[in-house]
From Swiss-Prot:
Pfam families listed in its UniProt record: Glyco_transf_56
GO biological process, one term: fucosylation
Protein's name according to its UniProt entry: TDP-N-acetylfucosamine:lipid II N-acetylfucosaminyltransferase
UniProt xrefs under HAMAP family: WecF_RffT
Source organism (scientific name): Salmonella schwarzengrund (strain CVM19633)
Topology in the lipid bilayer: Peripheral membrane protein
UniProt-listed Enzyme Commission number(s): 2.4.1.325
């Protein structure tokens, strides 16, 4: 039997760390198909912190792609599970036959599915990537992303799967210590990445609430982002008074980030695609409602779990926010499909499907 190989095809340290730790701590002990990884980027201590995994690192996305293609050609029974897919060479290999459809199983992370970049090289590449995506052996994704993907590629098998957000189920029923009263605190975006459209979001928040709310913007990740942080701060200070605007430019440890989220009353995410599911989960767990773009298909996942959804096009005010908080507080969090530990069984199923052991 050929063991499934997992591929992290782009050097995205935060996401790669989450995936590797999840496999090491949760999946590797029960499945031989959860132990082999090919990773773009440096080791950064992963080998030491994930002893249950066999990890091979590659200095560039191209080097990793070449290694994957060589393995795929050497053994056509070898199957790969691609987690996210931000590697042009791998898509082209699927198009050219270097990797066969039956070898290629893909967990959609959101950004790798949608065509939102306006750069010329992206606009030229998107049609090719779209054709390649129709040739994969199967996809795993959120409910909303499965729906989006199926409209373009109805013949490709799709299975529900959620990114393994680090969550403590014991916090599901823990009431917030502070009383929900007074000035609202609004979280804008889930990172410092430009895909959060911070400037557009800040203007939208100001249009809805004016300078009457506290605005928190976490921008400590990714690194080397100071010019964009300064740009966001300049626009933010033109809209909000200094005491109402908090732009966080330093990377935060998980516990500190969790504490920050629990001080908020509302999450505001203006981007028109599925992303930031980890932050959304942690907010929902703390009875903090989220405002989504209506074009972000994750609202379908939330509605399926009977969670209140607010949209950027809604008329928002404190009364609306407090009512959404009340509705969230009445939901039994232990039954939410995309919460830990409920997302575990779909992962076991995904491993068997990608490995060819399940129909």
């Amino acid at each position: 039997m050929t063991v499934l190989i997992h591929v992290l095809g782009s050097d995205i340290p935060h996401h790669n760390h989450t995936v590797l730790r999840f496999f090491n701590d949760t999946l590797a002990a029960t499945s031989e198909h959860a132990r082999e990884f090919m990773v773009a980027g440096e080791d950064n201590g992963f080998t030491e912190s994930c002893p249950a995994l066999s990890l091979r690192f590659y200095g560039s996305k191209k080097a990793l792609a070449q290694a994957v293609i060589a393995k795929a050609k050497a053994n056509r029974r070898q199957r790969f599970f691609f987690h996210g897919q931000f590697n042009t060479s791998l898509w082209l290999a699927l198009l050219s036959g270097g990797i066969k459809p039956a070898q290629f199983y893909w967990h959609i992370w959101g950004a790798d599915l949608y065509e939102v970049s306006h750069g010329l090289k992206f606009r030229l590449f998107y049609p090719l990537r779209r054709i390649a995506q129709g040739r994969v052996g199967g996809v795993f994704a959120t409910r909303g992303d499965l729906s989006y993907f199926a409209r373009q590629h109805p013949g490709v098998r799709g299975e529900l799967l959620y990114f393994p957000t680090r969550m403590d189920p014991s916090l599901n029923s823990m009431a917030k210590e502070r009383q929900r009263a007074g000035k609202l605190t609004i979280l804008v975006g889930n990172s410092g990445d430009r895909s959060n459209e911070h400037i557009t979001a800040l203007r939208a928040v100001y249009q809805q609430f004016g300078d009457t709310v506290n605005v928190v913007v976490p921008m400590g990740y990714p690194a080397n982002n100071q010019a964009y942080i300064d740009e966001v701060r300049q626009v933010g200070l033109a809209l909000f008074s200094a005491e109402n605007l908090q732009i966080l430019s330093e990377k935060m440890e998980f516990d500190a980030y969790l504490a920050l989220l629990r001080q908020c009353d509302l999450g505001y995410f203006i981007f028109a695609r599925q992303q930031g599911i980890g932050t959304l989960c942690l907010l929902i767990q703390a009875d903090i409602p989220c405002v989504l773009n209506r074009d972000n298909p994750f609202w379908q996942d939330m509605a399926e779990q009977h969670l209140p959804v607010l949209f950027t096009t809604d008329d928002l005010n404190e009364q609306v926010v407090r009512e959404a908080q009340r509705q969230l507080a009445s939901v039994d969090k232990s039954g939410i499909t995309f919460f830990s530990p409920n997302y575990l069984q779909p992962w076991h199923n995904a491993l068997r499907i990608a490995a060819g052991e399940a129909e």
